[in-house]
Amino acid sequence: MPDELRAEKSFPSKPYDSLKNKSEFDRVYQKGFKKHNPFFSLFVLDLSQEPPKEKAGFKDPLFCRLKDKKTLYLLGLSVSKKVGNAVKRNLIKRRLRSLTLKHAALCQGLALVFVPRSDCYHLDFWALEKHFLEMLTSIKNYMNKALKDLKKGITHTYAKQ
């Protein structure tokens, strides 16, 4: 088949990659900043400030995926069966992916994990977007304050080393 007749990729590449295994999720849960509201919990790890952990020839998978590809951020969705049936869970996941795509510039260099609660299904997209933006800007302000304090040598409970 001639090259002129071949179809190009119809979908643009997504700007995020997903968290793949339990160890990656656990790292975000343990070292990241957390924020909760009645609809979902958001865990955020700033990968640009996080030094890559390297052991005898092993590269850090989280850090490498951001540096090697054109990936802006990493996304993890942990939707429990308590939230609802498969249709409801998939709707929530589609909405959360769409939110992060819409606000990819805010998510750049971060590893995000969403843990929706059962009330999340009843929110429309715009209310979910409002809560997401409030939480993400709050966490980013918190992380900036913690980073400034660490540079000054002040350690608080929120300034993680």
UniProtKB/Swiss-Prot annotation:
Matching HAMAP family: RNase_P (MF_00227)
Pfam families noted in UniProt: Ribonuclease_P
Keywords, alphabetical: Endonuclease, Hydrolase, Nuclease, RNA-binding, tRNA processing
GO BP terms in the entry: tRNA 3'-end processing; tRNA 5'-leader removal
EC number: 3.1.26.5
CC terms in the record's Gene Ontology section: ribonuclease P complex
Keyword Amino-acid biosynthesis attached: no
Organism: Helicobacter pylori (strain ATCC 700392 / 26695)
Family: Belongs to the RnpA family.
Reaction(s) this enzyme catalyzes, per UniProt: Endonucleolytic cleavage of RNA, removing 5'-extranucleotides from tRNA precursor
Protein name according to UniProt: Ribonuclease P protein component
